[in-house]
């Protein structure tokens, strides 16, 4: 019966180590996605410390790949030292992921205030030229999120760009995709996106932060199961004389 429990734990442990390799790739992808998205929205969110959870989760992903390799070798060879190392590293990674979750919630709460502070400045510097980074960022966000202005398209009337052009129109990036004849004129508001960009940028950034949080929580749960299985194998190996005899007399002695 004890041997059956050992075999089951080892089988689950090997399977979990294979999952760790997959998890490593997923975590690195999530972290990279945060970096790429931040690059698209960095004008609206200047606090680079928000990237800390992404940096940590990429590091955890790389470490999980190594952990999976150590775990597989230690489980197959039934190495007490290897399994103990495996458990300790998993515990450290688990603690790190808890930190990622906490940081994720902290920075998620800061998103709204940070965007509100930055977006006003970005819209004021808009000049409508492609080489200008702020102008490109605004046009990109308005096209991607289907929005116009900070709260709505009327916000453009308060910008220097609107006053200087004197043509009573907003940027073409405010035009709905279905309005083929749209020229940005305020005389045809039905051709323009009605929703403002601030709320949508906040929502987008908070969703990304939640992806990091859920990824960390999901893989932390898997790591707990991995630590449990490794501890079962270690404990049975130490307490069961018959199991110890089987190991020392086998191929991996």
UniProtKB/Swiss-Prot annotation:
Residues that span the membrane, as ranges: 12-32, 51-71, 86-106, 213-233
Carbohydrate attachment residues: 127, 152, 167, 183
Signal peptide as annotated in the record: none
Localization per Swiss-Prot or TrEMBL: Membrane
GO cellular component, one term: plasma membrane
Residues in compartment: Cytoplasmic: 1-11, 72-85, 234-253
Entries under CDD domains matching the protein: TM4SF8_like_LEL (cd03163)
Keywords per UniProt: Glycoprotein, Membrane, Transmembrane, Transmembrane helix
Matches recorded under Pfam families: Tetraspanin
InterPro entries: Tetraspanin/Peripherin (IPR018499), Tetraspanin_animals (IPR000301), Tetraspanin_CS (IPR018503), Tetraspanin_EC2_sf (IPR008952)
SS bonds (residue pairs): none
Lipid bilayer topology: Multi-pass membrane protein
Principal subcellular localization: membrane
Extracellular side: 33-50, 107-212
SUPFAM superfamilies: Tetraspanin
Keyword ATP-binding: no
Highest taxon of the lineage: Eukaryota
UniProt family annotation: Belongs to the tetraspanin (TM4SF) family.
Subunit structure: Interacts with claudin-11/CLDN11 and integrins.
Function description: Regulates the proliferation and migration of oligodendrocytes, a process essential for normal myelination and repair.
Protein name: Tetraspanin-3
């Amino acid at each position: 019966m004890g041997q059956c429990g050992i075999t089951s734990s080892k089988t689950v442990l090997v399977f979990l180590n294979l999952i760790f390799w997959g998890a490593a790739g997923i975590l690195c992808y999530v972290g990279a996605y945060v970096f790429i998205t931040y690059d698209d929205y960095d004008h609206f969110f200047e606090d680079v410390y928000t990237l800390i959870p992404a940096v940590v989760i990429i590091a955890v992903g790389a470490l999980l790949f190594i952990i999976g390799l150590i775990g597989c070798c230690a489980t197959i060879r039934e190495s007490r030292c290897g399994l103990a190392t495996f458990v300790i590293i998993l515990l450290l990674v688990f603690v790190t992921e808890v930190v990622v979750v906490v940081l994720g919630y902290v920075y998620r709460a800061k998103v709204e205030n940070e965007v509100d502070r930055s977006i006003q400045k970005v819209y004021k510097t808009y000049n409508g030229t492609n080489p200008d980074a702020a102008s490109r960022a605004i046009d990109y966000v308005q096209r991607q999120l289907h929005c116009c202005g900070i709260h709505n398209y009327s916000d453009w009337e308060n910008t220097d760009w609107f006053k200087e052009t004197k043509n009573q129109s907003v940027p073409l990036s405010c035009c709905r995709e279905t309005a083929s004849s749209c020229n940005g004129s305020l005389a045809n508001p039905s051709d323009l996106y009605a929703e403002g960009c601030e709320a949508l940028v906040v929502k987008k950034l908070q969703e990304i932060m939640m992806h990091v949080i859920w990824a960390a929580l999901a893989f932390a749960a898997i790591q707990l199961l991995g630590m449990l299985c490794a501890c079962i194998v270690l404990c049975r190996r130490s307490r069961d004389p018959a199991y110890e005899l089987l190991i020392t007399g086998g191929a991996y002695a």
